[in-house]
């Protein structure tokens, strides 16, 4: 793990360090970035370029303490900066067709990154919640992993279009 100091506020063209670290930054301005975080940031920027509209970040990197407070799972990809909860302003985030459409774009981007063979075998993940979506990268599954948690209970792999 490395600590880096950034000049300016952006991690990528469209994502800022404030979005990345919200409430988790050290008081001296340091942020925790893992090697796989760079892969995730690259994938996010490719996704953002493809969709052509702003993504509003609820949560990206989490410390263990913050993750516990907000009810995150023990091995959350947020702990490595490899997951982001986000939404589109003014859009219905409960629309399954839109979720599937955007999750498929995310899946395609991760597949392209895997074709480069630079980062090992990673898989994408996408979750649907009330009011926001979760996108991430992971290596615990051999395929794109997705879920629906809008009811408050997680239903794994519910969308046949994403299998």
Model regions: which residues?
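Short connector loops at helix/strand junctions that flank enzyme active sites
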Residues: 50-52, 79-83
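Extracytoplasmic cell-surface/polysaccharide-interacting catalytic and binding patches
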Residues: 1-48, 130, 138-142, 146-163
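Solvent-exposed, flexible loop/coil residues
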Residues: 19, 65, 70, 74, ...
């Amino acid at each position: 793990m490395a600590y880096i100091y950034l000049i300016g506020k952006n991690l990528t063209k469209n994502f800022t360090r404030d979005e990345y670290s919200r409430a988790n930054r050290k008081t001296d301005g340091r942020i925790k970035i893992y090697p796989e975080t760079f892969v995730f940031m690259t994938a996010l920027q490719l996704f953002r370029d493809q969709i052509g509209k702003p993504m509003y970040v609820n949560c990206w990197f989490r410390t263990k303490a913050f993750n516990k407070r907000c009810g995150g799972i023990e091995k959350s990809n947020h702990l490595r900066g490899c997951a982001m909860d986000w939404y589109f302003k003014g859009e219905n985030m409960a629309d399954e067709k839109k979720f599937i459409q955007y999750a498929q774009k995310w899946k395609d981007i991760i597949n392209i990154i895997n074709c480069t063979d630079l980062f090992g075998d990673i898989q994408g993940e996408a979750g649907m919640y009330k009011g926001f979506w979760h996108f991430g990268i992971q290596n615990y599954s051999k395929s794109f992993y997705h879920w629906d948690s809008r009811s408050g209970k997680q239903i794994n792999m519910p969308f046949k279009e994403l299998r």
